[in-house]
Amino acid sequence: VPRDADERRAENQPRVGDDHRNGAPVTPEIFADTFGFRGVQFGNYVEGDRRQSDLNESFDALMDLAAVLGVPPRALSLNGRLGLAFGARGKGGKNAPVAHYEPGTVVINLTKGSGPGSLAHEWWHAADNYFARDFGAGGFATDGVKLDGMRDAMQARFKEVRSATQALPLRRRAAALDKRRSKPYWNTPIELSARAFESYVIAKLKDQGAANDYLANVVDEQVWNITEAARAEFFGGESAETYPYPGQAELPAVRTAFDE
């Protein structure tokens, strides 16, 4: 997730949902046993209270994600191939990613400043890449790669996600954002599907009367549009529609694509 725009709210709101830890801090052993990640890495800055906080919040977020998807928690580690890092693999500097997934090493890194809020986004990238790798193609399944040997039902699901996100007005808004970049990013099947997945997760949690900003924190469309209007006034020119997530009218199509 590169820092092209403030697509996340500045602060995460308190989580709302079931108590997955019985009110107690989670230990590294319980975390490892619950999810089965290949490894969990912390950067040098992540010490003491911050390390425990990251463990607790990521534990709750992953449990919430498993509930949304209807899968066992250990399934989120993608057969134990996925690794998780907290502020351990970022490069820093201007416009550095706030969080990223590394397909070469199969690791999600959540950075110190703004990584929390991006977990659902980066997990989708990992799953998208996992299924493409698992069936010999490499790359990402939503990028249209050939998936030899994958069950027809699973192939159809990825095609539906790709088709649905490509058909949304979101794609036009993403293309407008990409005009500010030297190469496409927002308007790529990989990114469109990841942002649609975030909105899907938020909507499914809302159905349960729950919310988890550590898992997915997305700026409100109205706030984004106000900021964009101010940007256009400052730099000159017209304010384009650029909201990088599905709007309320687009959510039914997103739900259908991910629910099937």
Which residue stretches match the model-derived regions?
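Divalent metal-coordination and catalytic microenvironments
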Residues: L65
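Extended, Lys/Arg-enriched charged tracts that mediate electrostatic binding to polyanionic substrates
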Residues: L62
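Active-site-flanking segments in enzyme catalytic domains
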Residues: P2-N56, V71-E260
